[in-house]
Amino acid sequence: MRAVQIDVHGGPEALVVREVPDPQCGEGQVLVRTVASTLNPVDWKTRAWDVGPALPATLGWDLAGVVVASGSPEFAVGDRVIAMSAQVATGRGTWAELVALPEHLLTPAPKSLALVEAATLPLAGTTAVQALDKLRLQRGDRLLVTGAAGAVGGLAVQLARQAGVEVDGLVSRPEHVEPVRELGAGTVTHLVSDLPERAYDAVFDTAGVDVTAALVEGGGYVSVSDEPLPDVPGAAKSYVQESAKDLAALVELVDAGRLRVRVAEYHPVSEVRTAHERFEAGGLSGKVVLLF
């Protein structure tokens, strides 16, 4: 089978598509033929930085595909599934034509989406769910999401609105303002200087931007960026954890028409270097999908 691997850390040129042995499906595991995956910030960071499992390593966290062998009573051959694999910690990369994962990581794919769209949901959606859970938001609270046009930020806007939270967004470019409004945000701006002072009960920071002046005293602050936390009492990082339960809840919202995903570009796996270049250039409003 083909897989996307790195032998050294570096730029997009470090990515290699090569033949590797097919994985075996053991007891309690499910073997999935990959239809699509996506690019996430952790993927280019793992490629570029000296982090992650021993090399050579297969990259990728998101998975959408079809079961081709099962050592689990929960999944049968032919089932459409999605999953998130914590590649950095486990070494189980999903950028491969066949992926074997523990059964507890998989959930049935949304019925209302093609698998190439469903691939956008696992890491970004799980990250948003778990970060918002940390904030313990109440109906009527006012939330600011930074990086609201990104995959995580855009899903967070929608999820918070579903919970009855008033959501505003900070984006990096003027052209991203209207798309974020369409996701349900109230006020959206690309200028930090436009943010009202001491107006938000909570901040979900996906972009590493200093917006502490906009937070009420004692407000909640959760970040998934690589930047250091601001000097705010109780400020916390949120590190995503594998959770089929969270993923199943997201699937339910998608199939109910209450949560939508966004795709910016599709690339065949043979163009993975180009996909990385486009992703790192920024400015996209939606996910970059890899097709297998």
What function would you assign to each model-found segment?
Residues 248-292:
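C-terminal hydrophobic helical "lid"/dimerization subdomain
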Residues 70-74, 81, 169-179, 209:
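Short glycine/proline-centered loop/turn elements that form peptide/ligand docking sites
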